From Swiss-Prot:
Mg(2+) 1 binds at residues 624, 628. InterPro entries: Isoprenoid_synthase_dom_sf, Terpene_cyclase-like_1_C, Terpene_cyclase_plant_C1, Terpene_synth_N, Terpene_synth_N_sf, Terpene_synthase-like, Terpene_synthase_metal-bd, Terpenoid_cyclase/PrenylTrfase. This is Bifunctional levopimaradiene synthase, chloroplastic. It catalyses: (2E,6E,10E)-geranylgeranyl diphosphate = (+)-copalyl diphosphate; (+)-copalyl diphosphate = abieta-8(14),12-diene + diphosphate. Keywords: Chloroplast, Isomerase, Lyase, Magnesium, Metal-binding, Multifunctional enzyme, Plastid, Transit peptide. The lineage of its organism: Eukaryota, Viridiplantae, Streptophyta, Embryophyta, Tracheophyta.
Amino acid sequence: MAGVLFANLPCSLQLSPKVPFRQSTNILIPFHKRSSFGFNAQHCVRSHLRLRWNCVGIHASAAETRPDQLPQEERFVSRLNADYHPAVWKDDFIDSLTSPNSHATSKSSVDETINKRIQTLVKEIQCMFQSMGDGETNPSAYDTAWVARIPSIDGSGAPQFPQTLQWILNNQLPDGSWGEECIFLAYDRVLNTLACLLTLKIWNKGDIQVQKGVEFVRKHMEEMKDEADNHRPSGFEVVFPAMLDEAKSLGLDLPYHLPFISQIHQKRQKKLQKIPLNVLHNHQTALLYSLEGLQDVVDWQEITNLQSRDGSFLSSPASTACVFMHTQNKRCLHFLNFVLSKFGDYVPCHYPLDLFERLWAVDTVERLGIDRYFKKEIKESLDYVYRYWDAERGVGWARCNPIPDVDDTAMGLRILRLHGYNVSSDVLENFRDEKGDFFCFAGQTQIGVTDNLNLYRCSQVCFPGEKIMEEAKTFTTNHLQNALAKNNAFDKWAVKKDLPGEVEYAIKYPWHRSMPRLEARSYIEQFGSNDVWLGKTVYKMLYVSNEKYLELAKLDFNMVQALHQKETQHIVSWWRESGFNDLTFTRQRPVEMYFSVAVSMFEPEFAACRIAYAKTSCLAVILDDLYDTHGSLDDLKLFSEAVRRWDISVLDSVRDNQLKVCFLGLYNTVNGFGKDGLKEQGRDVLGYLRKVWEGLLASYTKEAEWSAAKYVPTFNEYVENAKVSIALATVVLNSIFFTGELLPDYILQQVDLRSKFLHLVSLTGRLINDTKTYQAERNRGELVSSVQCYMRENPECTEEEALSHVYGIIDNALKELNWELANPASNAPLCVRRLLFNTARVMQLFYMYRDGFGISDKEMKDHVSRTLFDPVA
C-alpha cells in the first residue's frame, strides 16, 4: 500500500513565464470586459451560445433541442441511471435573496452603521488583547477575607491590608451573602460568606453584616447537599469543615449538627488520612492550593520549600496569606502586595492567569470565526505562551505555576501546533496514571468534562506515529460519549451556557469534519458571555467570556453571509446562463458546490477563490456525470480531444448538443480563469489549467473504458486513477491562483500535483466518497470502487473488512494531512494550505453519513441553510 499512500502523482505541469495573454484562435469567443469573478459577468448567455454554435455549423441551442426530442434512431440511451433528486434550492428562492440594489439608500445606511459597529468592536477587542497582563478576573470574597485576616507586621494590631477589610464591609449582597452576583451556587455562596463572617468576627467589625450573613448561611447551608457534586469548589471538603470549627469557636450561631455537615467532616477526615505527610511537604500537589484548610497538619517551615517562584502557593492568595500568618515569610508578603497592586482592595481566587487567559481568548475568537481581525494579537499571545512552554512538563494556568495541568497543556499544544510552533505531543505523558488513563493534574480524584474536551480536541491534530494522541482520542471519546449518554456532560471546572452542546458538536464533528462556518455558527449559539469557572470559588475570565466577542461574531457572521448570498446568486446565474439548467443527465447542485468552499474559505478577501472553486466544482460534476451516465464512449473521446485541442470544432460530428453546452461552459469559464490568473499572478496560467483539465478527462475516459469493458482493476490501479477522477486536484488548482498570494513554481510544486499534500487530499476524498457511494453504484451496475476492488483482490475478505481497510487508509492519510497543514518548515502560504486541507475536510463532512452531495436534501440541506441563508439572531 505504500505505493498508493505516498507516491506523488506524475505531472509535468509548469507555469509559463510572464507572456502576453493570448486567446485561443480555434473559435472566436472574445472575453467579456468584466472579470469572470464579477457578479455581472456573463460567459455564455443563450444568444451567444447560438451565435457561437452558428460559427461552427450548429444551429440550435441546448435549450431548443433536448435528447428526448431527437428522432428515435438518434436518441441516446443513458448507460447508467443515477436517479438523483432534483435541485434542493430552487431558482426562485435564490433570486429572492436580498438584492444588493434593493432599497439601496436604506440598506447602505444600515450597512454603514453595522460596519462602524464592527470596527468599534474590533478596536475594543484588540485593546483587550494588547492590555493582557497577568489576567483580568473578578474578586474572590473568600480569598479577600483570608488576606484581610493578616495583622499588621508593625505590631499595631490593625489589619495589614485594611482596604480588604473595607471591601468586605462594602460588598455584601442584598441577600446577606458574599460572592459572584451573576450566578448562585450554594457551595460557592456559603463558602464565601462563611469566610467573610470569620474575618469580620476576628476584627470585631460589621455587626449588621455579620447578622445578615449568619441568617443567609443558616437558610442556605442545607441546600448544598442537593447541589451537584460538580458545583463543589476545589478543596471544599478540606477548607469548609475547618472553617466551621473556627466559626464554632468564635460563637457564630450556625447549624453545625446537620447530617450533611457531619458527612463533610467525615470526608475531610478520610482525605487527610490518605495524605502522607512526606508527600504534602515534599511534592508539588494540588493541596498547596488549600493550605488554609490543613493548618492542623502542616509543618510551616517545611512547606515553604514548595513555594512558587512568585512567592505564592499555587497562585492562591488565601493559601499564601495563611502561610504568611504562620511564617512571616517575606516572599509571601511580596506576592500579596503584588496582587493588591493590581486589584486595589480585593484579590481573586488565583493569580496570575496569564497563560490561561491568552490561550482561551485565542480559542474563543477562532471558534467564533472572528480571528482574522486579530492576527497580530494572536501571534503576540501565542509567542508569549510559547516563551513559557515547558516541553517536558506542560503548562498550567500561569507562567509560575509549578503544577501543570492537561487542560492548559492540551489547549496550548493544539493551538500552538496549528499555528506552526514546534511542539511535541510527548508532553501529554505527564498526565497519565499507572493504568494509562489521563488526568487533569497529579492527585486528581475526579475526571472533568472540559479538560477531557480540550484533550479530545487536541488529539484530533495528531501527526503520523503519535500513539499517545491516538490513545488520548480513545480515552476522551469514551468519557465524553458516556457523559452525554448519562446526561452528565457538566463540569467541575466550569459552569457554561451549553457545555453538553459543545461536547455533542465536538463528538459529531471532529476536527476533520468541523468546517469553520459550521463551528462558528454552533459556537455563537453555545457561547456564554457570563460563563464562569470554578476554583476555590466561582471566578470569571473577563477577557474570555465577554459580550464583545459574541456581538462581533454575530455581526460578522451575518455580514459575511450577505456577501455569500450575492456570490451564490452569481454562481446560480452563471449556471443558468451557461445552459447547465437544461442538461438532462447531471446533478443540479450549484448551491451545494458554492457551499463546499464558502463553509471554509469564508473570508471576504477570498471571494475570487470561492467563485473559481465553485465554478470548477460545478464543471467537474457535470463532466463526471457526462462521462459516467450520458455520453457514448466515442463521443467522450471526441470531447476529450476537443479539450486537449481547446477547439469546439472537434465536436462537429457529435449530434448531442448537450456535449457542446458542456464544452462551451468549460471553455469560457477556464479562459476567464486564465485572464484573471494573468492579472493575479503576473504570468500566463491558462496552459497550466488546460493540462489539469486534460488529466481529469483522461481519468474519466479510463473509467468509462473500464465500465464499457466490465473491467475491474486492482486496488492500486483503481486508486491511482480514482484520486484524479475525484476532481479535487482540479478544483483546487483552478482556484489556487486567486488566494491573493503569488505562487512561483517552487511554491506551487509544494501544493500541486507534484506534491504529497494534494495527493493526500485526493486520496482521502476519493476513499471517503467510495465508502458512502459504492453500494448505490453497485446496485446500478457499476463494478468499480475501492471497496469492490479490494474485495475482488482479497476474496476471503468480507465487505466490513474491506471498509475497515479503506477507513484505515483514510485515517492515516488524515494524520499526514495534519502535518502538511501545520508543518513549521512549509513555504506555502497558510491560506493555500488551508485551501487544500479544507477541501479534504469538506469531503469528510459531505460523506459523513451518506452521499451528502447526491442526497443533499437531508443533513447537507441544514448545513447549507445555516451557513448561507439563515442569519444569526
